[in-house]
Amino acid sequence: MGILEKIKDIEAEMSRTQKNKATEYHLGLLKAKLARLRQQLLDPPKSSGKGGDGFEVLKSGDARVALIGFPSVGKSTILTKLTETKSLAAAYEFTTLTCIPGVIQHKGARIQLLDTPGIIEGASQGRGRGRQVIAVARTADLILMMLDANKGEIQKRLLQEELESIGIRLNSQPPNIYFKLKSAGGVNLTATQTLTKITEKLAKSILHEYKIFNCDLVIRCDPTVDELIDAIEGRRSYIRCLYVYNKMDHMSMEDVDRLSRQPNSVVISCNMNLNLDFLLDKIWDYLNLVRVYTKLRGASPDFNDAIILREGATMEDICRFLHKELVSQFKYGIVWGVSAKHCPQRVGISHALEDEDVIQIVKK
């Protein structure tokens, strides 16, 4: 029996099994088997074949955003609207057959936007170009899930299932679980709080399903079975996602209002250029980028040349960005902006910067 058949059998058994206290142990083991089989399906073959067809795109710019969606939902159109790249768009499906990059210029940042081929149901199991598309999604800092507003909820559920099944977790954080394999000593399981969703017996059985008999497992949260499996697998991507409902010009105002109030959602119309500026601002917010401006002593800062960093960046990050030897030469920094308690403020190398701060670096 092949892997796909085993996956289908387990999924069928899970759908037949009523979920209650008596069956949660059995369902937990089934979930572990299912996750292990799906990972086997995704692992690349060891044999080397001919080179690829150029589907992968070199990462560039300050951040990467991937467009994911079913065929003919407006991915190519929005790439053309937000960037200077022309991606073939048509009213029929599967217009885009490879990955097409573009660059969004917004607030001084260069954001790489990737238009991927339309996903079809079963993509995670290899249908269409699903595996390549999902591999690109793993490398993104943000996923824009493009949805047809008239079919949005159905498409959203199917795409979430496809991404979840191959280890992409949308708008969530990794569970606070420490896991480390050992060569001997058995399973050392420690929970720092009461476990209400799994038992110690179930946790050890899931480990045994993965042929793990020696490890340290420290659980600092109250995880579900799925979260425990994620920690054991270790190959999970936690990526922020914006649900972009296109074709709002074909909807009633009541439906537009309802969709726009949903978490992590934006309603737009590519054809009529509605709400595209708001979408750009949302992309900026979700990428957690900050702009930092530098100045020389006695000179004014150049507000047309920002250094783009991640939220939480420090003076040390700025030094490394400017020159690798600047960290060792750093004496102190002077900061004007939101992060300063008073302007200007003399700061150390660990000082955290905020958006639109102005800095001056003084060397030893």
Swiss-Prot record:
One of its GO terms (biological process) is cytoplasmic translation. Keywords: GTP-binding, Nucleotide-binding. Residues 288-363 form the TGS domain. It comes from the Eukaryota. InterPro entries: Beta-grasp_dom_sf, DRG, G_OBG, GTP-bd, GTP-binding_2, P-loop_NTPase, Small_GTP-bd, TGS. One of its GO terms (molecular function) is GTPase activity. GTP binds at residues 69-76, 115-119, 246-249. The keyword Nucleotide-binding applies. It holds the Pfam family MMR_HSR1. Residues 63-288 form the OBG-type G domain. SUPFAM superfamilies: P-loop containing nucleoside triphosphate hydrolases, TGS-like. Belongs to the TRAFAC class OBG-HflX-like GTPase superfamily. OBG GTPase family. This is Developmentally-regulated GTP-binding protein 2 homolog. It comes from Dictyostelium discoideum (Social amoeba). The lineage of its organism: Eukaryota, Amoebozoa, Evosea, Eumycetozoa, Dictyostelia. The gene is drg2.
